Amino acid sequence: MLVGKQFDSVFRNVVGSTRDSQEEYDILLFNGDSVFIIEVKYRVHPKDIDTLIKRKGGNFLLLLPQYRDFQRHLGLATFSIEDAVLQEALDRGITILQRRGDLIETIPAAA
């Protein structure tokens, strides 16, 4: 459960492409009206936030137009993230999934 929603389907390494562009999405979670785009990084850097928002998120509808009516959410799954980078991601609407021992902590984006 993320952003208060249950996701029913999980797909890994999904490739969307057109003649001019191609993108691989690490994890896509789906339910009937929402898609959660999750990029997986060992350690998150500030440029990863821009890549997720501008390139991966920005190209999503172009590459996978069948989901144009779905509400889109962005997330970063990581082992390590500095506090300043974490706050930037949250402020920009990205949910963080961070491993803490055997558990995954979910840090929701700022409302």
What does each model-identified segment do?
Residues 5-32:
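Active-site metal-binding core of divalent-cation-utilizing nuclease and nuclease-like domains
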Residues 16-17, 44, 81, 103:
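Residue-level detector of flexible, active-site-proximal loop/helix-junction positions
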Residues 20, 55-59, 77-79:
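Short amphipathic alpha-helical surface micro-motifs
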Residues 25-48, 52-60:
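Conserved catalytic cores of phosphodiester-cleaving nucleases, focusing on short active-site segments
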Residues 58-69:
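Arginine/glycine-rich "motif VI" loop of SF2 helicases in the C-terminal RecA-like domain
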Residues 72-111:
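Domain-level recognition of nuclease-like catalytic cores that cleave nucleotide substrates
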